[in-house]
Each structure stands twice: as C-alpha cells, then as structure tokens.
Amino acid sequence: MDLRDIKEFLKDALKYIIAIAVILIVAIYVVSFQEVIGPSMNNTLKSGDITVVNKLVFRLRNIKRNEIVSLKKDDKIMVKRIIGLPGEHIEYKDNILYVDGKKIGDSRSSSTKDFKLESIGYDTIPKDMYLVLGDNRTNSSDSRTFGLVKKSDIIGKVNIRIYPFNKIKIF
C-alpha cells in the first residue's frame, strides 16, 4: 500500500463516519419510527401500524389539542391524542368534551364515560402537563388511569403512518 492508497482509504472511511454520524443525529434528535401496540387508538391507528414520530416539532412550537403524540409513561412507549392543555379544566359529560365549561366537538370517540379532571386529583392542568386519551375510549389506558403526562415525557408528534402501505396517511 502506498501513500495514495492510504489517503484514498481515509477519505472513504471519513465519508462513512460522517454518514453514520448524520444518521445517528437524525435518529436521536429529529425522527423515529414507532409501532402502534394495542387497540387504544382504533380506528385512527391500529395495532401493528408503523408511524414516523417528529421529535423536533415541540421544541419549535407548543403542543396543540387533538395532536397524536408518542410518549413514555411508566417505561412504556405509547401513542395517544392530546385532549387537555396546561391551564384548562377538562370534563366529559354525556359523551361531550367540555374545556373550561365550553362544549368542544370530539368526533373521534363513539363512547366516553363521564370524567372530570378532579377524579385524577386536579382542578386545572398544571404547567407543562397534558391530558391524553386513546381514540378508542372504551379500551384505552390513558390519563384517566395513569394521570397527566409531563411535557418531558412526550417524545414527539406522530406525523405519518407509513405501514400498512395501503393506508399511508399524514396526520
């Protein structure tokens, strides 16, 4: 091996190292793939669906109601919908969502049992905390059972369902 071969080898190696570093940075800080597990998001997302999670978006803007998010709770990664925002009082009565006493449309659920924020120990949602529910309200472990979710436990926004291929959808 002469000096030119060594230089060429080092150039190629550097290209691969840079490519791997970029891929790792994107995977750690920008996007990830997540499989939906369980029926809690039926019919929006079903068990086995693969989604793309945008990890960067909530560093750039606030979380909004009705966004689908990936979160970590009790060492489990799950997908839920944001229903309640910081400073709000949430109540479900007769299958209708009320935010601060005002009726809000919620067409994603066919059946939601009556629920008040007070039943999980709050009058209003504290700063940097959120109330999340599964779209399949009758079969979901969500804020009604495990409490509010800290902003720091929200991994990112579910942007796209990429599998199954015949049901690709942008959210």
Predicted ranges, named:
Residues 77-81, 85-97:
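Mid-length scaffold segments of soluble, non-membrane domains
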Residues 118-171:
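Soluble extracytoplasmic domains of inner/organellar membrane proteins
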